């Protein structure tokens, strides 16, 4: 009898977990379905071949903790697909975006990568995944099966060297780190630098790179006074901040996303209102302003995409994005937008979706997008010019 | 700096204490560790955000409504998932695992409806602070302590001075005998879940206001650490929950100061393991209770 009851309760639990998984999955499923029907009607109007669409996979966290990034990628990708479809599609075929939800977990990403490579005759390439660690578990699967992967966000140095089919439309962190240190030392004139970093592969690696750069500037009187590693999303950073402040830091480089920068700025300014806070381009998002409020005024960081740019093509893109999704695009979403554009342009130039030819074309491509002129080097990395941005009165402005 | 770290630790600990109270309430009556409590706490903060910021109902009505709704969520959880298990006479482990499942469901529902991003939560008490012996205590920290103590006094009053409290204690001692005396044990349990939900909502609102941040997954780590606090204080004991929370909060602050931020999150769980080995009943726990 007891065993029976146990079995029943286990079943119930399994059913519940399954339910939770389903409800999470169905959310993403319906958006994908909606998207497809939307683009189909566009296809009917322009007389494109929608029976043989070119499918581009967007694999990123659509649910869970980092879903805002994945949804941003998917939104940007759909916008780019719409742009192509309005102009007759790619190779006269309709462009379709297929979303995959990896929940920013390496395990899920592996399953998704295997699913994508099993359908590689239909899928022209993958835009994703989101975090460097997840990208690096999925990348070998894509490489082995000759599927093109362009990550709009991975910045770990080792990512793109995994293979020829692996690209990134984001600067390597060593270059961006140099730009952040440059802001702290040359633009703000700070000598005593502290680091606060999240305990992920990316965070630890980035803080190591920053340390190395600071080490090389010792002769200029620049000094690393303290380095604190914190758990991502622990919300309370006051203890680490008390240590940094005690060590006499004049500027703090925050190795983390907006969800680290905003609370650190708030909690640090309660202790020391004069602290200078420097971040990275992945903190460039309107959520930083919403979450940080007054405290993030004065936070500086280098970006390769700046939404308030004077350039007409960027203005048009930002307007279209804002109109469609109700908020200005973040830097990473914009990099996803360009990634889709580059992949489709390469396919158009080659006249075929054969991944080997498209890959070769990508290495030759000179793409002028909203995130600047992009050209992949031989490992699949990009080198872009940085714009230094700061926050003034609750708005992002260029640094003078 | 030591003093500042102690103040930080006390504020952090008060947060854990407020959540730990909810664990203790439910454990006291059901002998069940309710792992869905962390997500209920996140629900309280998120729903308060909806009332205060999106619907502009004002701070006090917003908090009260969120306490009411979160209390109802507690009742729903019991009604939908735990009561059927009790009726079937399932072993305690089944209820325990069920609460973990519920926790996932609540968190994912919040993500589906409100999104996973971290949002700004209004700070109620301003940023003014009092300088004390070289450290700074903020108004928010003081109010957190005051409100937590008031909440605890109210809970103690309910449990020891009211009729429903008498019924709660009776059900706790012997559910079968209580039922024979005409106590509606299921109602008492639902009431307990309601109280736990109310205290979780208050904890969520205060902590979200302190850090000025709110997001669906905020209950996961906080819930686990509050569980350690509840075990340290003696699970089932209300003053124990408060003391346990304060100790865990301060231990974390001290760990950051002397060992580095890297060790911070492990401290709560090291304490949990040590307590379970050295003093399984916790600081205030009664002896001889059969644990789940």
Segments (PLM) and residue ranges:
Chain A
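Positively charged n-region of N-terminal signal peptides that target proteins for export
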Residues: 1-7, 11-12
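Extracytosolic ligand-binding ectodomains
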Residues: 2-4, 23-400
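In a subset of proteins, long, contiguous C-terminal domains/tails are tracked
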Residues: 11-14, 399-400
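C-terminal motif of bacterial Sec signal peptides marking the signal peptidase cleavage site
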Residues: 18-21
